[in-house]
């Protein structure tokens, strides 16, 4: 018999070790796959049902056309439903409002909270501006109506009288939407009792928390927080992280859940990646020239929101653009609140393409002191004429949901990074594409560099996030210089002052005095237009069109590309609503089809239009059929 050959002990041990290592590798790979699958399941987008929302809220969202929750909603809603304090930071347009409204309403749906009769609202929602107050109130009222539940929400502003506030709160609403300045006024007037608020308040929401302190609401917030019970759930919503948010967090919250969320591929970007950011270097005197080139040569996409820092500059810009046939509307804190809301509604509805918004909070202290000094001098010269008081609660960059704004232009630069982020956040909302163009003068360059360095990521510090605007050549700008400078000289301080007064007189018609009339006759309100010319003299006809010899070839090609992109998006409507050849034909057809002329007693649908030499329609018909 043959002897079996035995392997050395060392060979056997090495084979065993190899097999064990292979088995361990297989086990590790399997564990890695399981972990990846679990992670994918956790990261997979959840539905509103999976978040534990009430079926009535889900039906309401379906009616509003909202099918899936955003990332901030997926993360925040479960924690809020559990009753935890939450600090949530997410970019503008990411759905923060619904992230707190949905769980807030669900908690108020419960039988316990509805059955108990309370002497004060159960939920306070505090926002920085009246415009945002109106927006949040409209959203929560819409959800309540669609859910068909017995809940009531009211909005209060500091301009309301004590009797108006008392009437608004007479129905014992569950939700109060207000600015921080209004709450202490309610306490002082006896409209709200601090003890009743302390007993009833269960949820406090601070929306746009990064702006509440920076715009002077600290004392108001301290008076509110002093009566907040410890059991009250507090929510802070913010677009940026700042020392003010940290200050509020320490002041109000107890062991909060901190959510800092960005969308896929967004990393820590403060401005959404779907917003392209550009800049143009020019002198302060040449800003009018450059904005004329941008708008008149059509190298930026409509609708356009233009930010300026002073009211006078806004009117100067409007008058300047009017001379070239460019209609625009103005939004500032000097206008009555109803007018401001109506301007926003018309702009969102697409009745005009250019809105000039005053962000006077972007002024530096020095600029504000200088403006105040000039105003005092003016008042001393003419005591009879006093300037209208500005609304301290006006804010156009603070969370306002502008619809389908494709381009934001910073005619004047904001004085802070936060201000820049909030301005740019007015475009690119709900994941749509957008762009921004900033006009930078030498005096603004230092602040601009601070903004650029803040936005630059740690990994890509050498890459400029804000790039030079490529579609406007120097030749294209210079070709318009003579016209622009000539027109700019005609827009004097006197013309600006007169147009400012005229605009205010025009907008008074939307004030509280006529509010009841417009509520009963809403069609009358639709007839009001906010982009009407303010200049007393009609613009020169030759300024409306640019001769071909002045247009730069490269810029003309860029303009064609922008128009093609606009057509692809279905945004081909001209500002002012319609117009053009088709509308003219419609007018002619209406004028030509007089029913008295076209009526035929024989029953023919075609009347006697076009009859000649006494021939009737039947003979004409016979001639045609032969």
Swiss-Prot record:
It catalyses: ATP + H2O = ADP + phosphate + H(+). Keywords: ATP-binding, Coiled coil, Helicase, Hydrolase, Nucleotide-binding, RNA-binding. PROSITE patterns: HELICASE_ATP_BIND_1, HELICASE_CTER, Q_MOTIF. CDD domains: DEADc_DDX56, SF2_C_DEAD. Residues 363-381 have a biased composition (Basic and acidic residues). A motif (DEAD box) lies at residues 207-210. Residues 77-259 form the Helicase ATP-binding domain. It holds the Pfam family Helicase_C. Its EC number is 3.6.4.13. Residues 9-47, 356-385 form a coiled coil. Residues 293-477 form the Helicase C-terminal domain. Residues 1-48, 363-388, 568-626 are annotated as: Disordered. The Q motif is unique to and characteristic of the DEAD box family of RNA helicases and controls ATP binding and hydrolysis. Belongs to the DEAD box helicase family. DDX56/DBP9 subfamily. This is DEAD-box ATP-dependent RNA helicase 16. It comes from Arabidopsis thaliana.
């Amino acid at each position: 018999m043959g002897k079996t050959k035995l392997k050395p002990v060392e060979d056997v041990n090495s084979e065993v070790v190899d097999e064990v290592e292979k088995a361990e590798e297989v086990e590790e790979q399997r564990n890695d796959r399981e972990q990846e699958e679990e992670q994918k399941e956790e990261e997979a987008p959840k539905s509103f049902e999976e978040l534990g929302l009430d079926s009535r809220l889900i039906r309401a969202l379906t009616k509003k056309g909202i099918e899936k929750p955003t990332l901030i909603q997926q993360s925040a809603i479960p924690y809020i439903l559990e009753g935890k304090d939450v600090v949530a930071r997410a970019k503008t347009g990411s759905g923060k409002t619904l992230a707190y409204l949905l769980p807030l309403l669900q908690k108020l749906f419960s039988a316990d909270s509805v059955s108990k009769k309370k002497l004060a609202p159960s939920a306070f929602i505090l926002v920085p501006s009246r415009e945002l107050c109106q927006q949040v109130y409209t959203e929560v009222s819409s959800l309540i109506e669609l859910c068909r539940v017995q809940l009531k929400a009211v909005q209060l502003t500091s301009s309301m009288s004590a009797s108006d506030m008392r009437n608004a709160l007479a129905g014992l609403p569950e939700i109060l939407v207000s600015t921080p300045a209004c709450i202490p006024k309610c306490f002082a007037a006896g409209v709200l009792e601090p003890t009743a608020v302390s007993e009833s308040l269960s949820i406090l929401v601070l929306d746009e928390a990064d702006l509440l302190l920076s715009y002077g609401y600290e004392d108001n917030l301290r008076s509110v927080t002093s009566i907040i019970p410890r059991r009250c759930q507090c929510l802070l919503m913010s677009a940026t992280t700042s020392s003010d948010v940290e200050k509020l967090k320490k002041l109000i919250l107890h062991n909060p859940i901190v959510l800092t969320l960005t969308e896929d591929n967004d990393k820590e970007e403060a401005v959404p990646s779907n917003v392209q950011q550009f800049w143009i270097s020019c002198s302060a005197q040449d800003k009018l020239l450059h904005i004329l080139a941008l708008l008149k040569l059509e190298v930026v996409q409509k609708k356009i929101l233009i930010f300026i820092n002073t009211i006078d500059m806004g009117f100067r810009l409007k008058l300047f653009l009017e001379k070239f046939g460019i209609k625009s509307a103005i939004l500032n804190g000097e206008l009555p609140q109803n007018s401001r809301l109506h301007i926003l509604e018309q702009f969102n509805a697409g009745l005009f393409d250019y809105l000039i918004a005053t962000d006077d909070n972007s002024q530096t202290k020095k600029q504000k002191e200088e403006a105040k000094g000039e105003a005092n001098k003016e008042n001393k010269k003419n005591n009879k004429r006093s300037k209208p008081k500005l609304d301290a609660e006006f804010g156009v960059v603070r969370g306002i949901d502008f619809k389908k704004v494709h381009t934001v232009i910073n005619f004047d630069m904001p004085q802070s990074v936060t201000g820049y982020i909030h301005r740019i956040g007015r475009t690119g909302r709900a994941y749509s594409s957008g762009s921004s163009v900033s006009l930078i003068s030498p005096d603004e360059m230092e602040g601009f560099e601070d903004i650029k360095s803040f936005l630059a990521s740690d990994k890509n510090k050498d890459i400029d996030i804000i790039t030079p605007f490529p579609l406007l050549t120097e030749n294209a700008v210079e070709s318009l210089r003579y016209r622009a400078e000539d027109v700019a000289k005609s827009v004097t301080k006197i013309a600006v002052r007169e147009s400012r007064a005229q605009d205010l007189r025009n907008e008074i018609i939307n004030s509280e005095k006529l509010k009841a009339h417009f509520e009963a006759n809403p069609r009358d309100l639709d007839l009001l237009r906010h982009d009407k010319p303010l200049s007393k003299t009609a613009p020169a006809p030759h300024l409306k069109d640019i001769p071909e010899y002045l247009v730069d070839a490269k810029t003309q090609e860029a303009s064609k590309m922008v128009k093609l992109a606009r057509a692809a998006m279905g945004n081909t409507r001209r500002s002012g609503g319609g117009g053009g050849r088709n509308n003219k034909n419609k007018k002619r057809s209406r004028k030509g089809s007089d029913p008295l002329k076209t009526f035929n007693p024989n029953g023919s649908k075609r009347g006697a239009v076009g009859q000649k030499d006494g021939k009737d329609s039947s003979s004409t018909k016979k001639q045609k059929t032969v």
